[in-house]
């Protein structure tokens, strides 16, 4: 059974009397929308078509927020959450909605945001890229919290919009081998004498094994290190310690870097604890395949890949024979991408470190750009898109993890003579409101 620990007490809020409201739709964050006294009311956990009993928890000039107390009339799309920690853990927020409806809602939200802010619609809305809705995450970061009174360390995920840690026994969206480790890891950590020095725990299921990276704020005793090493060896784990300077030390395992590969390639994309990778392996494979298909790079073309990371898109694009220039803002990832390209024997791809908020058109290594791919963080790539008029690629694939920033950046792209020809929702994170998306822009004629 889940135990709920609070890092600090929350300030109590004045609740309204109980209200019965009719939910009409979902917002793009997955909250139900109802109306009361002329204002929109956002209700987490409520679904369209439902009558729900709520209490108002926050009242602003134009909207209110409410706590769901009871579903009086349930939607036919409502299902029972599979996770026993669902109502407390902040990791998932749509398990109460069947997966088909989740995907339909996300696709609709994406199209509405782009239409609203970019004042356009795609010529073609492509099929949603998706796979299994459960046990899909190959990587997760678990939080820890040490209770000074009980001397117990909790291992789990943060509660929604809170620093509180919800101790969990399993996770239904985490890969099964990783989920099975959680209770044993929690027990192990509580046997250590240096519990107060433990930070987060990063779990990764790579192609070459399971990696457990334990963040520590100070050196552990030899006895604690031995316990960790023995646990790692007995469970065939690659157990590593990481200090505050991001230095890592291997305690057990083969000592190699984790890597993943694509089904149609022998290339190994190696990565380190601090490197970003997509957590959903099968959907990432489909997304990369679609990006290559949309751009259709030719052997005589030059392709620019911005925010290239460790080469997730760059290496598959380079397999076509095109020259690929990958640009990344994190030096360590540029170095890793270069190593990955060399290991794959791809000699027409090169990687550079640059400030991606600056104008790249004058960089001596850039030259002519025929096609372009961009995969920015949640903040988007507003500054990079302003330089399109100088680069003038014939086609641009924009991969986004935030539909709001995609919508904003689309407006900039369209103003520079491009048309939005294709768009697709990418269900990278089932059971949550989060989504990836892909858009193809082509230079107008």
Swiss-Prot record:
Pfam families: TRAM, tRNA_U5-meth_tr. The keyword Metal-binding applies. Catalyzes the formation of 5-methyl-uridine at position 1939 (m5U1939) in 23S rRNA. It catalyses: uridine(1939) in 23S rRNA + S-adenosyl-L-methionine = 5-methyluridine(1939) in 23S rRNA + S-adenosyl-L-homocysteine + H(+). GO terms for molecular function: 4 iron, 4 sulfur cluster binding; iron ion binding; RNA binding; rRNA (uridine-C5-)-methyltransferase activity. This is 23S rRNA (uracil(1939)-C(5))-methyltransferase RlmD. [4Fe-4S] cluster binds at residues 83, 89, 92, 171. It comes from Shewanella piezotolerans (strain WP3 / JCM 13877). Keywords: 4Fe-4S, Iron, Iron-sulfur, Metal-binding, Methyltransferase, rRNA processing, S-adenosyl-L-methionine, Transferase. NCBIfam families: PRK13168.1, rumA. PROSITE patterns: SAM_MT_RNA_M5U, TRAM, TRMA_1, TRMA_2. Belongs to the class I-like SAM-binding methyltransferase superfamily. RNA M5U methyltransferase family. RlmD subfamily. GO terms for biological process: rRNA base methylation. The keyword S-adenosyl-L-methionine applies. InterPro entries: 23S_rRNA_MeTrfase_RlmD (IPR001566), MeTrfase_TrmA_AS (IPR030390), MeTrfase_TrmA_CS (IPR030391), NA-bd_OB-fold (IPR012340), SAM-dependent_MTases_sf (IPR029063), TRAM_dom (IPR002792), U5_MeTrfase_fam (IPR010280). The active site is at residue 401. Its EC number is 2.1.1.190.
